[in-house]
């Protein structure tokens, strides 16, 4: 017997609308560690949808560091950084990150979402407007909404569009962009945006969640790739759950900005610090990223990207202009993207379909992500499978058009 529900009609209607549009999201449970050869519902797959770009999430050195730090400092942070939750592993990680990136200070946050909410809501308000890229991550948009600041979004990657929006404001504000865009994989024109912010005396903030660890000299991300520093890029946000293979986030900035954020960034002030064990594991990850092994992993990832693009450019799809680990194939229709994703699963490839509202309407896609942990054979399997599925779909479409 079906139990009576007190769920509001508008909730049920919203869910039904998502179902009708093939946009329902669901959780998938892995039965294995975060590795390329994964197991889902007792089925074996080669996964191409993780953000573990360097393959460090299951690295034995990180596991050992996490265990050792937990033995010494426990598992829980216990409190916010400002009460009694800032332990020695947190301090060591902050100092190491600051030294690596060339900033005066680093502040740890529990998630990248919280870092962006904290920084933006503290620095912008009704009198300090925000101008940001139209394809920025949701957390950057939500930070602006939380700040209740005037928000204008410029055309993707278009510095001239950003210039026009900044010129409309008499007051100084905050210019924000992703470093690497999470759904397209392209890199923002950071040098030009930095110059624009400096020209108009605006603050400049970059979220380099998908660049740090993978790009630039010593893995220092878009900062190094674009030749920027702590002066030309005064507020840098990085996440630790991607190339670092752990969890959490940080803000790299000046002493003055860090002191200000310590007072006014509410998601920093009013939340428990990340686990000290995670901080210890992340420090081990940073050491790996800076080592010869880290460079070898970046080189292997770059080879995978080159091979993938060479193979896929011969298929009946348009490649996006990305030279990063994120290699999307835009399908367009949500239902078609789901069908292709399901067909790939039958060939042992796990690659999720990304649909609106995560991406703009009409641009549903396969968000393929590559990792240094993938083998050459994994890449061959992926490209062979894509060729089989996409070619068959094109032939079927031609048959339907002939009828």
Swiss-Prot record:
Keyword Disulfide bond (UniProt): no
Reactions catalysed, as given in the entry: 6-carboxyhexanoyl-[ACP] + L-alanine + H(+) = (8S)-8-amino-7-oxononanoate + holo-[ACP] + CO2
Family matches, as Pfam families: Aminotran_1_2
Binding site for substrate: 25, 137, 358
Keyword line: Biotin biosynthesis, Pyridoxal phosphate, Transferase
Enzyme class: transferase
Residues bearing PTM N6-(pyridoxal phosphate)lysine: 242
GO molecular function: 8-amino-7-oxononanoate synthase activity; pyridoxal phosphate binding
EC number(s) from the headed UniProt entry: 2.3.1.47
One BP annotation, GO: biotin biosynthetic process
Protein residues bound to pyridoxal 5'-phosphate: 112-113, 182, 210, 239
Cofactor: pyridoxal 5'-phosphate
Pathway info: Cofactor biosynthesis; biotin biosynthesis
Keyword Phosphoprotein: no
Subunit structure: Homodimer.
Known function: Catalyzes the decarboxylative condensation of pimeloyl-[acyl-carrier protein] and L-alanine to produce 8-amino-7-oxononanoate (AON), [acyl-carrier protein], and carbon dioxide.
Family label: Belongs to the class-II pyridoxal-phosphate-dependent aminotransferase family. BioF subfamily.
Name used for this protein in its record: 8-amino-7-oxononanoate synthase
Organism: Marinomonas sp. (strain MWYL1)
Gene designation per UniProt: bioF
């Amino acid at each position: 017997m079906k139990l009576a529900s007190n769920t509001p009609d508008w909730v049920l209607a919203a869910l039904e609308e998502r179902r009708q549009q093939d946009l329902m999201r669901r959780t998938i449970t892995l039965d294995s560690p975060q590795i390329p050869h994964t197991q889902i519902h007792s089925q074996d797959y080669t996964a191409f949808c993780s953000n573990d770009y360097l393959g460090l999430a299951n690295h034995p050195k990180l596991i050992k560091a996490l265990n050792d730090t937990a033995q010494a400092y426990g598992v829980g942070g216990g409190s916010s950084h400002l009460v009694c939750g800032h332990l020695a592993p947190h301090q060591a990680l902050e100092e190491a990150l600051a030294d690596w990136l060339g900033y005066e200070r680093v502040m740890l946050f529990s998630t990248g979402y919280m870092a962006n909410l904290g920084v933006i809501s503290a620095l912008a308000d009704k009198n300090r407007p925000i101008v940001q890229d139209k394809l920025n991550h949701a957390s950057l948009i939500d930070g602006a909404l939380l700040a209740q600041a005037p928000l204008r979004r410029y055309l993707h990657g278009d510095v001239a569009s950003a210039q026009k929006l900044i010129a409309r404001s008499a007051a100084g504000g905050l210019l924000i962009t992703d470093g690497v865009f999470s759904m397209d994989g392209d890199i923002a024109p950071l040098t030009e945006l930095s110059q624009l912010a400096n020209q108009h005396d605006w603050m400049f903030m970059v979220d380099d969640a998908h660049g740090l660890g993978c790009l630039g000299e010593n893995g220092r991300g878009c900062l190094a790739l674009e030749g920027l520093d702590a002066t030309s890029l005064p507020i840098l946000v990085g996440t630790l759950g991607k190339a670092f293979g752990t969890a959490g986030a940080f803000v790299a900035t000046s002493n003055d900005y860090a002191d200000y954020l310590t007072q006014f960034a509410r998601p920093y002030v009013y939340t428990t610090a990340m686990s000290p064990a995670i901080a210890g594991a992340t420090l081990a990850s940073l050491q790996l990223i800076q080592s010869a092994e880290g460079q070898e992993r970046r080189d292997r990832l770059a080879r995978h990207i080159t091979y993938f693009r060479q193979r896929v450019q011969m298929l009946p799809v348009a490649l996006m202009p990305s030279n990063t680990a994120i290699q999307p194939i835009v399908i367009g229709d949500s239902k078609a993207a789901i069908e292709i994703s399901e067909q790939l699963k039958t060939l042992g490839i796990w690659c999720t379909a990304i649909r609106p509202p995560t991406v703009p309407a009409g641009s549903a896609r396969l968000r393929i992500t590559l990792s240094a942990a993938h083998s050459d054979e994994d890449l061959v399997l992926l490209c062979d499978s894509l060729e089989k599925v996409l070619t068959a779909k094109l032939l079927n479409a031609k048959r339907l058009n002939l009828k």
